[in-house]
Amino acid sequence: MSFRGKRMKNVANQRYYLVREDVLTDAMQKTLEAKHLLSSGSVSSIWDAVKQVDLSRSAFYKYRDAVFPFHSIVQERILTVFLQLQDRKGTLAKLLETVTITHCNVLTIHQTIPIQGRANVTLSLDVTSMTCDLDDLIQQLKRLDFVESAEVISSGAL
């Protein structure tokens, strides 16, 4: 399956880890710095952010959806998930039912118009009362037969 013109890795069994900053690669650390510059409003574009921290744009795009500062996850407890769904009747309702069962509070929903039998959905969730861990939630979403991909795109403040 391709996504944005690139071959996607099989993400069905991805897990999330908490690691110390000193074990992150230089590119990962600079990606976090660039994301901070963007979220704080210090810079107005990705190009400006990566230039300021001396990082290539390709490295930024490689890591931007994979590394998150721990404090933002703990403080905000807001999770944004991107899903690609098959266009079938009732998919959004079933997706929201799955999210509700885990006691996540849906803050925003954005769904694109289905094109070629697929639609993209972005959910912003308050996970303060979530009854499972993040890995379990993502796995539950991926197990839905109409979900082609599900990935965390942000957690807390970027």
UniProtKB/Swiss-Prot annotation:
Span of domain ACT: 80-155
Domain of life, source organism: Bacteria
Gene3D superfamilies noted in UniProt: 3.30.70.260
SUPFAM superfamilies recorded: ACT-like (SSF55021)
Membership in a protein family: Belongs to the UPF0735 family.
HAMAP family reported in the protein's UniProt record: UPF0735 (MF_00707)
NCBIfam families tied to this protein: PRK04435.1
Protein name (database record): UPF0735 ACT domain-containing protein Bsph_3944
Organism: Lysinibacillus sphaericus (strain C3-41)
